[in-house]
Amino acid sequence: MPLFPESAYQLELPKMHRVLQKFDTTQLENVEETVRAEMHKKEIGSLVKPGMRIAMAVGSRGIQNLALIVKTVADELQNMGAMPFIVPAMGSHGGGTAKGQTAVLEGYGITEEAIGIPVKSSLEVDEIGTVECESGTVQVVVDHYAAHADLIIPIGRVKPHTDFRGPIESGLCKMLTIGLGKFEGCTRLHHMGAIHFPTLLPDAAKLVIDKTPVGFGVAIIENSYDQTYHIEMVPADKIHDREPELLKIARSKMPKILVKEIDALTVQEMGKDISGAGMDPNIIGRAARGRLKDFDGPEIQRILVKSLTKDTHGNASGIGLADYVLKSCAETIDLGATYTNSVSCGNPEGGRIPIQVMDVKEGVLACLRSGVGVDLNAPKIVYIKNTLQLGEIWVSDALIEEVRRNPQLILCDEEQSIEKLQMS
C-alpha cells in the first residue's frame, strides 16, 4: 500500500555523489607477528603452563582479522604445551542458544576445523558471587566451561559503548561479564540498568578476575577504516588500569560522517557484527533512550535501513533506531533472535520494527516528508554502507559545497541515483 498519493512520487530525488573521507590510515603491518610477539612477553608467556586447559572467550562482533588473531593465539598456546578451546562470549546473541552462538562464530570463520581446537558452546553458567549497585544486588555468573578451565583469555575489541559513557566501556571487562555471562548473566546485569554500567561492569569484571582463572586479555583496537590498529595482551591484574587508556586511543580512532546536517540518511546494511546496536550510536547519535550524550556528529533527521548483514543471522536488534526500513529487509528479520537479544539487554525499543516501505525512493521520500524544515528542492541526503565502514560515503547535490570546503573530504567524479546505489 503506497504511503503517499501518486503525485508525491513524481518528486525526483537528486543525484548522489561519491565522497572519500580522510582519516588516519595507520594500521598494523603484520597482525600475526604482533600477536606472536605479544604472546611471548614475559608477563604473558609465564602465565601459560604445559597441560593447561585454556578457555579462549570469543565474541560476536565483526572484528577485522578476528579468525587470524584467534588462530595465532591458539597456535602459540599449543606450542607452549597448553590445550586451548573456544567458548562463545556473546551474552544473548545467537538467539540466546548454544547452537546459535556456535553459528555466529562459524560466520567469522572460527570453527574447530579452521582454528584446530574445540569449540565448547553452552548456556550453562556458574554463580561466582555478587556485586552491588544503586539498583540492588546482582549475582554474577560465568560460562561453565570457562569457569572450570585452568586459564581464561577474553579476546575482544576495545571501543566506545553504544549506550553509556565511563572510563571502561566496550572491551575486556564487558567480555568477562556480559559476554561470558551468557543469556543469564547478560539479562541480570542489564536488569540493573545501563546507567549503572560505568561502575557495575568494572566491579563485576573484578569479581570475575578474583574468582575465576582469568590469565590475560587480548585487546584489539581498529582504526577509522575498520583495520587492525593495535593488539595488546593485558595481564588480568592490569586490565582495570589499562583498559581506560586503550579506550581513549580507540575513541580517537573512531570515524564519523563529516557533514553537519542530514535530512535523510540511508544505511545499506546493519547488524550485530557491525555494532551491538546494529548501527553504532556513536556514528548516528541515536541510542536506545534518545540522543547519545556528548555526540559531536551530524544532526540526522531521519534514517532508512535497506538490509541486514549476512553475519547478523537475522538478529535486527537496534532496528528501532531507524525511522523506516525496506519491506524486503523486514522480511529477513529473525524475530526470535531479535526479541531475545532486545529483551535480555533491557532494550525492547531496539526490537521495534519501523515503518516498512516498498523501495528506496519511497523510503527517502518518507524521510524527507517527515523531517522538519526540509527543502524538498535541495534535500541533504547521505548514503553509507554501514556505520563501521565510513571511508566512502555518497552525498546529494545540496552537500557538495560543504564537501568542497572540508579538507578531510574528497569529491570524486562519480554520480548515481540513490535508487541504484549499492556499495561493495
State where each predicted segment sits.
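N-terminal amphipathic/basic leader segments beginning at the initiator methionine
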Residues: 1-34
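Glycine-rich phosphate/diphosphate-binding loops that line cofactor/substrate pockets in enzymes
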Residues: 38-55, 78-79, 258-259
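Short glycine-rich or small-residue beta-strand-to-loop segments that form or flank ligand, phosphate
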Residues: 53-62, 85-92, 382
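Histidine-anchored nucleotide/phosphate-binding helix
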Residues: 64-83
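An acidic, phosphate/nucleotide-engaging active-site surface
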Residues: 100-167
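Conserved phosphate- and dinucleotide-binding cores of soluble alpha/beta proteins
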Residues: 134, 145, 154-226, 232-233, ...
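A conserved active-site cap/scaffold subdomain adjacent to cofactor or substrate pockets
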Residues: 224-282
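C-terminal non-catalytic interaction/assembly regions of soluble proteins
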Residues: 281-424
